[in-house]
């Protein structure tokens, strides 16, 4: 995705799929992102700056590639992410929900 999106719902990335945010790309700042199945990847490495989403969910075998970008989890509900988070960027948890990270990062 290379454009700013205006939908406010959640985003699901199916197993084996990759959603890559490019220059100027964005997702809803409160929409949940679910990595649903082995090999599902959220790739922020090509984005031009920090990204904010809602809750992050996914099991082992899924991944988030930050590159050098920061990811803010602005959750209003509780979520669990069991996949791997890689890259040199950072992760910030904001909002009123609890985000649990159970994978090796």
Identify the function of each model-found stretch:
Residues 1-61, 79-88, 99-105:
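Surface-exposed loop/turn positions within long extracellular repeat scaffolds
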Residues 66-80, 86-87:
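Extracellular/surface-exposed low-complexity segments
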Residues 91-97:
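Primary detection of the long, small/polar-rich alpha-helical "axial" segments characteristic
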């Amino acid at each position: 995705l290379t454009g700013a999106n205006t939908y406010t719902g959640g985003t699901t990335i199916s197993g084996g799929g990759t959603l890559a945010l490019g220059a100027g790309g964005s997702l809803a700042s409160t929409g949940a992102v679910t990595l649903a199945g082995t090999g599902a990847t959220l790739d922020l490495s090509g984005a031009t700056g920090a990204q904010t989403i809602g809750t992050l969910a996914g099991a082992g075998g899924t991944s988030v590639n930050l590159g050098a970008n920061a990811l803010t989890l602005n959750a209003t509900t509780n979520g669990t992410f069991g996949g791997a988070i890689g890259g040199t960027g950072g992760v910030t948890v904001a909002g009123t929900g609890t985000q649990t990270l159970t994978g090796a990062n």
